């Protein structure tokens, strides 16, 4: 019988953390956070990390892995997760992967990181090209390196073009060759069965929960936490300082919005994130795995609809 990995995804404020605790306790399982912000030390309130008490009750992984000044991308998370899966399974326990960061979740289901090495010199070369010649400069060099083949990229998205050019230069290959090589990579965790579910709520109920959560974060000291993070060099990490909640507090601290505008701004940012999360979950998980929780209710671990994942 194959070992099984369990995946609990959910939009922000859906109640997945409470459900994860309940399910893990009932199954003698451990929890692996799949959140691109919770992995940073000091980003506690905005990431809604589990309390110290919860972390004592149930072993948690994937939290507080890096300083806010460090770069921590999906490739590092992927390697870390592989170690956690191996260790937890070796102890004969179940593992519940919990989160809402789509790209990080994706690393459990399909290859997302290839072996192209991009040196600092290449990165600087590409950035200088973009600064001097803009998108047109990137497209010209990509066209030359790819011998006129269609790029298959959003040609108005500079970030995508920058990364594509870096990978072409780092590998010496065309994008079509890189894609072919990437598609031949093995499926992650192919030896495991995978059971998935994702939590969601009706919009009106979710809106109320988002507002309540935001008010609570501010009352507990999100502004002060952000000030401390800034002192520690947080602004040098774009992924961290542009995340929902923290980005809005930074705007407030720069006097771009007022205190009265802060909570509505965070709520608006959170709703946009929820929309992105839903799109990803619909694409990745079968519709049968969606668990829609009714208003003013909490999900119960014995009433879940798990579906097989691939």
What are these regions (language model features)?
Residues 1-310:
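Phosphate/pyrophosphate-binding catalytic cores of soluble transferases and nucleic-acid-acting enzymes
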């Amino acid at each position: 019988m194959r070992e099984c990995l369990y995946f609990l995804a959910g939009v922000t404020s859906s109640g997945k953390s409470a459900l994860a605790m309940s399910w893990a306790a009932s199954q003698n399982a451990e929890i692996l956070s799949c959140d691109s912000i919770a992995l940073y030390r000091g980003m506690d309130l905005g990431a809604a990390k589990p309390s110290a008490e919860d972390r004592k009750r149930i072993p948690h992984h994937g939290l507080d892995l890096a300083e806010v000044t460090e770069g921590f991308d999906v490739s590092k998370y992927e390697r870390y997760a592989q170690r956690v899966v191996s260790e937890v399974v070796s102890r004969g326990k179940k593992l519940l992967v919990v989160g809402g960061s789509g790209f990080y979740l994706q690393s459990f289901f399909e290859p997302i990181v290839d072996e192209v090495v991009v040196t600092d010199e290449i990165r600087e070369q590409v950035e200088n090209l973009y600064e001097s010649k803009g998108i047109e400069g990137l497209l010209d060099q990509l066209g030359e390196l790819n011998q006129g083949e269609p790029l298959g990229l959003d040609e108005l998205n500079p970030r995508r073009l920058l990364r594509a050019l870096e990978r072409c230069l780092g590998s010496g290959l065309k994008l079509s060759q890189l894609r072919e090589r990437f598609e031949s990579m093995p499926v992650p965790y192919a030896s495991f069965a995978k059971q998935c579910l994702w939590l969601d709520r009706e919009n009106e109920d979710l809106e109320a929960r988002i507002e309540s959560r935001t008010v609570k974060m501010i009352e507990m000291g999100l502004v002060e936490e952000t000030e401390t993070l800034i002192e520690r060099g947080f602004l040098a990490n774009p992924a961290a300082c542009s995340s929902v909640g923290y980005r809005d507090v930074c705007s407030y601290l720069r006097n771009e919005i007022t205190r009265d505008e802060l909570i509505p701004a965070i709520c608006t940012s959170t709703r946009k994130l929820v929309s992105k999360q839903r799109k990803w979950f619909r694409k990745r998980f079968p519709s049968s795995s969606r668990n829609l929780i009714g208003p003013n209710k909490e999900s119960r671990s014995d009433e879940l609809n798990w579906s097989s994942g691939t």
